[in-house]
Amino acid sequence: MKESGPPASLLIRIAALAVTIVFVQIGVISEVPVLGITIDVSPLLVAFVGLLCGSTLGALTGFAVGLLVDLLLVQTLGLTSLVFTVIGYWAGRLRELRDPQAALTPLLVGGAAAATAMVGYSLFEFLLGVDAPVSLELLRQIVLEVVVDTLLALPMWLLVRRVLDPSLPDDPRRRRRRAYTTGGLSPLSRA
């Protein structure tokens, strides 16, 4: 009996996109400060994979991207994985439970993912005893990063959707409705 699961082409596309985005994030984006903060598009990637592919692939992508980030930046191993797994899972659950198709969904999910990533990572670092000053500067950085990531959410959503759309299985809830055609016999066409 053949197991049903995501197509291999979808998994390959997710892996290639994740590796590319993480390397671009670490090599290019993080080197260009905007408003005194470094932009982090990794939570956006994880949230949008979850929003397009569901909770299982969202959580797996979150774990893999978080582990890759932790390994490349030599951070506390598994901390980013934990936070990104939660982000991917809940974005996927949003898709499975509500099927959001509003135009503002990518902005709201992107803002929530950025806030969850920043607050979650800061909280876990504080709980692990990392000596970092907790002040209004940290709050300013969190707010600015959430705002900037929310602004970047729409372009990131378009990129992730464009890369993954050809491999996504057809979802019966998202079928396009055909316009009713009369074969040219419409009374409006005679005018």
Q: Locations of the language-model features?
A:
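Terminal, non-globular segments
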Residues: M1-A191
